[in-house]
Amino acid sequence: MQMERTELPDFFKELSTLVEDAHRYAKVAGVNFFKQNFRRQGFLDTSLTPWAKRSLTIGSDRGVLIQSGKLRDSIHAVSRGIDRIIYQTDPLAYAKIHNEGGYIVVTERMKRYFWYLYMKSTGSMQKRKNGELRQNKANERLSTMASFYKSMALKKVGSRIRIPKRQYMGESATFMKQLDTWIASEIDKRFSNI
């Protein structure tokens, strides 16, 4: 009596494929998760921690930390072997201070820049034919911006400006739970019929 040979599934091959797919999924899903924090306007760990509102509320139709989108678009994943992924941003000067919060020391260059912004905003105010300023919303907005720029320009060199923590990247229990759920479903899918 001769027995039939049955092909045994290659568990190790299937497992290594799963590890590679999980690594790829974690890189993409992590970057997307951290970019979602810009839409959420806060950091999602176990619950959402909303970001502090900006002090100058002009232009509030756009979200906090969103001006050009460079910070959000600079988030990417770097592989450190098959068992480690690091999420980071491109080397933007303001990325770390926004994520962690802290203080900025006022420099002479900053003061000159704020004087420039002040002059630019007051110069673009609309005037009547007799030279008086018009009483309209555009001028009101420019006036508010101009007073903010002037107050920043008048700060003493060496004084400190507090930048609130607006975390957009870091350890997140919600993301880890999503990743665990995905891996568990993939294990069920791949190994249930073997």
Task: Annotate each predicted stretch with a short phrase.
Residues 1-194:
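Short, Lys/Arg-rich flexible segments
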